[in-house]
């Protein structure tokens, strides 16, 4: 059994359901984030339990053939994606194996599986993003939650989102700072701006901007609107009111400040209208 602060060499032999690496040390499972199958690492134990332990890769002694350098600078801290450090082919292999294992373990059957179909697009494919807005030590952060926390990591130019979203977030940062807009403090439940919720219809190019606020109105919205009009495809600005102390992003009530309050996409020849509350597969 390993103990906290132990250090040893570890070979990563599998992945967890969340995409982290796992290896065995004297029969005990050791979970290590940001590792790839085939990595040989120097592992430092940060939490030890009877049946498993959580480690940190202090050094990659021998990198896996599947390992790549993450394109995103925030990958190690941001919880937005799990596989930025491995080749796309390895990611597909893992996902296919995960499905097959579920059929065998849970269903007790072993059907024949066709090869997984790869996507031609591995970046910029998501049509929706919900950005929490926070201040930490006076610094404004708009991005995604850090792994296993509600601390917000500034998203920068997230490679999973359309480039238009990055421009919109920069507009919001300037507008917030120039107009002293308060941002939500989750611990005490005060502050106005909670989330920025963006949607893009890829077939039409239309973009919806929704601000989620802990209040009843959005101050200086005219200035924000004029800046948003510089974004190609911007179609509508909606304010969603959520005054509950909750982790749920959207409240029930929406106010339409500009446009129709929805955007239109086309999927398999069918025209679809999308409001803030619409369910639509994100990728």
Residue ranges and their predicted role:
Residues 2-282:
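Accessory RNA-recognition modules of RNA-modification enzymes
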């Amino acid at each position: 059994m390993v103990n906290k602060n132990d250090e040893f060499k570890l070979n990563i032999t599998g992945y967890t359901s969340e995409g982290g690496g796992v290896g065995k040390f004297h029969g005990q499972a050791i979970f290590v984030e940001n590792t790839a199958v085939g990595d040989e690492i120097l592992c430092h134990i940060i939490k030890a339990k009877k049946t498993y332990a959580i480690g940190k890769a202090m050094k990659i002694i021998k990198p896996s053939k599947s390992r790549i350098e993450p394109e995103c600078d925030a990958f190690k801290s941001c919880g937005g994606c799990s596989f930025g450090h491995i080749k796309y082919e390895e990611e597909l292999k893992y996902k296919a194996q995960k499905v097959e294992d579920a059929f065998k373990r849970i269903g007790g059957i072993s059907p024949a599986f066709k090869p997984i179909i790869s996507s031609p697009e591995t970046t910029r494919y998501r049509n929706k993003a919900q950005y929490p807005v926070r201040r930490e030590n006076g610094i404004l952060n708009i991005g995604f939650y850090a792994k296993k926390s509600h601390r917000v990591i500034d998203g920068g130019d997230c490679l999973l989102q359309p480039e238009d979203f990055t421009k919109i977030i920069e507009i919001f940062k300037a507008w917030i700072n120039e107009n002293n807009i308060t941002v939500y403090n989750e611990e005490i439940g005060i502050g106005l701006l909670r989330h920025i919720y963006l949607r893009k219809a890829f077939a039409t190019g239309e973009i919806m901007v929704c601000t989620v606020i802990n209040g009843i109105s959005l101050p200086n919205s005219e200035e924000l609107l004029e800046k948003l009009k510089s974004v190609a495809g911007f179609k509508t600005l909606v304010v969603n009111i959520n005054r509950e102390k909750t982790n749920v992003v959207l409240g029930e009530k929406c106010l339409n400040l500009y446009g129709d309050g929805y955007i239109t996409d086309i999927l398999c020849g069918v025209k679809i209208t999308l409001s803030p509350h619409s369910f639509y597969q994100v990728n």
